Amino acid sequence: MAKKSAPTEPKPVTSLTILYHLLREKWPEYVLEVIVIIFSITISFALDEWKDNRHKQELEQIYLKGLYSDIETDLGQLKEVIDETQQVIQTATHLSGLTPQAPETNYNQFVSNVRFVFKRPRFIAEDATFSDLKSTGNMQVISNVLLKKSLFDYYKQYETIVQVETAELETTNTVVAPYLLKRLSLGAASMNVPKSGWSMMTGEVEFQNALLIRRTTREELLHDYQHSLKLGNQILALIKPKLN
């Protein structure tokens, strides 16, 4: 008679076993949940990136419009300053050619020309938008690299102009003005007062040096103004196609 085999003891149920059975039975559900989670995260990141890009584009438009307006105003002012500076240079050249033997025929015209030569046309740039771009760290929203470089070149050129204009003012006040005030009465009330011996002034070294200083300084500034005008037009040409 055959012996009955002893019954096998059931395997102990562990947490790993339970997990294994759950995975076997419900793996499609788990996979679907993982896919849904990944998809949700991806959509969330994409939406955040879209919102960020849209905000940057809107901010860029605000700055581009501000820059365009500022520089457009600058160019109008530059054209006026260039025109006045050219007139100052022409008048200074005319006065430099006078001599005691061939003076200005009219004293009043002579004084008027001297007064005009010492006009100081100034260029004051509108830089509020550019300053805000730098101070807020928003320069990164300007997507065009060439535009950013051109902006820095333009406002660096403006700083050069300010330095030359400041030096011009100091020279005029300390060197030129004291001499002229001793030799001529430049007030409007004196224009009709006849003077004698004034033509001799045109041959004085101090007078010719004063005119030379004015002419050379204004010629330097004229070059700087014209360069700024060129840079400004280039910037407007870069900005205009990007405006909405």
Where are these regions (language model features)?
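Long, hydrophobic alpha-helical segments that serve as membrane-spanning/inserting helices
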Residues: 1-28, 46-244
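Hydrophobic membrane-insertion alpha-helices, especially the h-region
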Residues: 33-46
